From Swiss-Prot:
One of its GO terms (molecular function) is protein tyrosine kinase activity. Gene3D superfamilies: Transferase(Phosphotransferase) domain 1. Its EC number is 2.7.11.1. PANTHER family: CASEIN KINASE-RELATED (PTHR11909). One of its GO terms (biological process) is regulation of protein localization. This is Casein kinase I homolog HRR25. Residues 395-418, 432-444 have a biased composition (Low complexity). The active site is at residue 128. The modification Phosphoserine is found at residue 143. It holds the Pfam family Pkinase. GO terms for cellular component: cellular bud neck; cellular bud tip; chromosome, centromeric region; cytoplasm; cytosol; Golgi apparatus; monopolin complex; nucleolus.
Length: 494
């Protein structure tokens, strides 16, 4: 039985949860396009989906704002159909073992600034800035950061007169305590400054892997919020941003000194990180940590498969197989990371726990040498496998292209860049993959993209009239099962 909303959108597996509802994978039965469907019970104590859908419609057209396809009531549920997106930044953060490089954080920050500035420019504040509410796109929008979950958003000024809402106190905490601003904890009405302060906490979290107020013990939610507030009040900006470039400290100090109704200087804040990117000689090429790690792993495994196919490597040998234990998974990730650092040393610059000061760009760039030294312990066969895998990909790509009357361009060979810059190892294969994704998107080929936390739930439809295909299911998910590990022998030498 097909369970549908809006007559043409079929409900699939559960893929996540928002502030006031669950989100499911869906399919447009007419076009085959994949979508996301958010359901909220009409018996909810504080229904928000109708309000959220109106905010989406009002913000539609902005870069990184999902497009709403349909909203309405189906049976005992309010349903909203929007664009299907990729993994959240929290999912990707966990994939990268809870640490992003400075380059990835800067590239994300510049996009997140733009999303928040657009929302503020349309007279709304988000009020729940956190990694879970920023998702990467799919296909040709795979490098674009999207913002979701406007159930807690609020209009902070009049649409016509732009008159700001009045200052108030004794407000309850709205949002996520970990990333909430100090003024939000103090019960002060939120405004634009609070979204930006929350974003600062998110960026520091990405760099350091945690925030000082995580892991505090408490018996009640109120006690936990109070302890988080106390910790935030006692941690200075200098301490919070120790070990990070000075620009992070300047950003947090600026946000904390904003007045309630003051318009932030978004250009100044963006310029802080743009200038830092220039000082560190980064390129905004949208090649994030997870992109490089997945690409590196794929190239090594590609060479493993070729060696097994040629008979040069036994798939069941100790060199080609690996245990599925947790320790071995961690070791595998570390080897992949070292491989990526060896090939792309200027990309992986990280926060160092021992740093108690704000490192200069020159000190950060010195990590390039450390990255090379750290990767020197890798077996030569791993480095050769990565090189061979990349070379095989370049050789096979022209053969995979669709034949046409015009000759296909040949892939460029790796060349050492002038002035001792890094070789152009990766753009060509990744850009060609993006071009193929773009062509598939234009041909309306459904793309199977799921979030890292997706598991198929069990759907009980016994309480529904099977003759009414448009009635949504009574969602009763069984406890989620962890994803099954790959069998031994799926990673070369890892």
């Amino acid at each position: 039985m097909d369970l549908r909303v809006g007559r043409k959108f079929r409900i699939g597996r559960k893929i996540g949860s928002g502030s006031f509802g669950d989100i499911y994978h869906g399919t447009n039965l007419i076009s085959g396009e994949e979508v996301a469907i958010k359901l909220e019970s009409i018996r909810s104590r504080h229904p928000q989906l109708d309000y959220e859908s109106r905010v989406y419609r009002y913000l539609s057209g902005g870069v990184g704002i999902p497009f709403i396809r349909w909203f309405g009531r189906e049976g005992e549920y309010n349903a909203m159909v929007i664009d299907l997106l990729g993994p959240s930044l929290e999912d990707l953060f966990n994939y990268c073992h809870r640490r992003f490089s400075f380059k990835t954080v800067i590239m994300l920050a510049l996009q997140m600034f733009c999303r928040i500035q657009y929302i503020h420019g349309r007279s709304f504040i988000h009020r729940d800035i956190k990694p879970d509410n920023f998702l990467m796109g799919v296909g040709r929008r795979g490098s674009t950061v999207h913002v979701i979950d406007f159930g807690l958003s609020k209009k902070y000024r009049d649409f016509n007169t732009h008159r700001h809402i009045p200052y108030r106190e004794n407000k309850s905490l709205t949002g996520t305590a970990r990333y909430a601003s100090v003024n939000t904890h103090l019960g002060i009405e939120q405004s634009r400054r609070d979204d930006l302060e929350s974003l600062g906490y998110v960026l520091i979290y990405f760099c350091k892997g945690s925030l000082p107020w995580q892991g505090l013990k408490a018996t009640t939610k109120k006690q936990k919020y109070d302890r988080i507030m106390e910790k935030k009040l006692n941690v200075s900006v200098e301490t919070l941003c120790s070990g990070l470039p000075l620009e992070f400290q300047e950003y947090m100090a600026y946000c904390k000194n904003l007045k309630f109704d003051e318009k932030p200087d978004y250009l100044f804040l963006a310029r802080l990180f743009k200038d830092l990117s220039i000082k560190l000689e980064y390129h905004n090429d949208h090649l994030f940590d997870w992109t490089m790690l997945r690409y590196t792993k794929a190239m090594v495994e590609k060479q493993r498969d070729l060696l097994i196919e040629k008979g040069d490597l036994n798939a069941n040998s100790n060199a080609a197989s690996a245990s599925n234990s947790t320790d071995n998974k961690s070791e595998t990730f570390n080897k992949i990371k070292l491989l990526a650092m060896k090939k792309f040393p200027t990309h992986f610059h990280y926060y160092k726990n021992e740093d108690k000061h704000n490192p200069s760009p020159e000190e950060i760039k010195q990590q390039t040498i450390l990255n090379n030294n750290a990767a020197s312990s890798l077996p030569e066969e791993l480095l050769n496998a990565l090189d061979k895998g990349m070379e095989n990909l370049r050789q096979q790509q022209p053969q995979q292209q669709v034949q046409s009357s015009q000759p296909q361009p040949q892939p460029q060979q790796l060349q050492q860049q002038p002035n001792g810059q890094r070789p152009n190892y990766y753009p060509e294969p990744l850009l060609q993959q993006q071009q193929r994704d773009s062509q598939e998107q234009q041909q309306q080929v459904p793309m199977a993209t799921t979030r890292a936390t997706q598991y198929p739930p069990q759907i009980n439809s016994n309480n529904f009239n099977t003759n009414q295909a448009s009635v949504p299911p009574q969602m009763r998910s069984n406890p989620q099962q962890p994803p099954q590990d790959k069998p031994a022998g799926q990673s070369i030498w890892l």
